[in-house]
């Protein structure tokens, strides 16, 4: 599902999309909230936003978490966001991102924020500081702010993020997290001067069903990109 709790239609004051989705997995009731950066109105084409309002994600998150806890009573609440991860909340000219939101919420009110937008592999070198040159296949320590884990799997399908949680006595504990490289390669130069690109980790085979599903869309996009516009 497409989820976003903070995108509203100005003319009606109603949300344009589902704010959350509920899932039953392993006997647990899991709520997933969607949130979108309010920078969208600034960086997108304004002609598409004449009747659309992007409200502050952190404020909407508080409302939605409250509503879920009162009405749905999930065992776990996660957030999937497109807001960006900025070290120690230093977002510069960008709208506040995941770190700032986590700090503004009740402690531990989300088990995890699965983010995007800043296109970083969020693997922390130390408190409030990401690794600058993360090497694919090496251990990755996610960020943790105010009792909330924050992860981001870089960009463009380069990684799959995997988080293993243990749920016991009503509490979620992260026991393992890793970024799994999807056939990423590095350049290796040999003593004879020749070089080649080799995989960081063992190759992941293509899934025929997924390729069948996605190829028509890839071809459609390719055809549009080949149209001469000037």
Please give the residue ranges for each predicted region.
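Short acidic, glycine-rich surface-loop motifs adjacent to enzyme active sites
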Residues: 32-42, 65-89
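Active-site-adjacent helix-turn-beta-strand microarchitecture at beta-sheet edges
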Residues: 1-55, 93-228
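Short, well-ordered amphipathic alpha-helical segments that serve as non-catalytic structural scaffolds
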Residues: 56-67
